[in-house]
Amino acid sequence: MPRSLKKGPFIDLHLLKKIEVAAEKNDRKPVKTWSRRSMILPQMVGLTIAVHNGRQHVPVLVNEDMVGHKLGEFAGTRTYRGHVADKKAKR
């Protein structure tokens, strides 16, 4: 279920502070975060945010289409290696 409009979007305060500082300085360096639950706001457009996927930080370049989504949606946590082929079927 989506979040109530009355409450507004959720974003961790420490991430919001980092983004405001990066926007002021026009810093091109990625902003590292572990907060996958934070929503992407219009202030983040154009910034690169390194989102943690459980193993490493995945760089995500934020564009206008991503506003309203969560950061974790753009950094997958699972590695899909494909289905194993049946050895009997190959013969």
UniProtKB/Swiss-Prot annotation:
GO annotations of cellular component type: cytoplasm; small ribosomal subunit
Keywords: Ribonucleoprotein, Ribosomal protein, RNA-binding, rRNA-binding
Keyword rRNA-binding recorded: yes
Pfam families: Ribosomal_S19
Residues in coiled coil: none
GO molecular function, one term: rRNA binding
Biological processes, Gene Ontology terms: ribosomal small subunit assembly; translation
Origin: domain of life: Bacteria
PANTHER family listed in its UniProt record: RIBOSOMAL PROTEIN S19P FAMILY MEMBER, SMALL RIBOSOMAL SUBUNIT PROTEIN US19M
Family the UniProt entry places it in: Belongs to the universal ribosomal protein uS19 family.
HAMAP family: Ribosomal_uS19
Function: Protein S19 forms a complex with S13 that binds strongly to the 16S ribosomal RNA.
This protein's name: Small ribosomal subunit protein uS19
